[in-house]
Amino acid sequence: MSEVRVGENESLDSALRRFKKKCAEAGVLAELRKREHYESPSVRRKKKSEAARRRKRR
């Protein structure tokens, strides 16, 4: 979990901005979206191979 300490003279807005940036860098939201619904291993393999195919084509 990302943690941000608010300084004495720091506004709450800037602390919130730093927190959001840390969460984005840590990939918290991406991980949340990925785990929102269960994916069976076969579906995961299929998505992975399709992504590799798309990367290879470009």
Swiss-Prot record:
The keyword DNA damage does not apply. Coiled coil: none annotated. Belongs to the bacterial ribosomal protein bS21 family. It comes from the Bacteria. Gene3D superfamilies: Ribosomal protein S8. Residues 34-58 are annotated as: Disordered. The keyword Electron transport does not apply. NCBIfam families: S21p. GO terms for molecular function: structural constituent of ribosome. This is Small ribosomal subunit protein bS21. Residues 43-58 have a biased composition (Basic residues). It comes from Caldicellulosiruptor saccharolyticus (strain ATCC 43494 / DSM 8903 / Tp8T 6331). PANTHER family: MITOCHONDRIAL 28S RIBOSOMAL PROTEIN S21, SMALL RIBOSOMAL SUBUNIT PROTEIN BS21. InterPro entries: Ribosomal_bS21, Ribosomal_bS21_sf. Keywords: Ribonucleoprotein, Ribosomal protein.
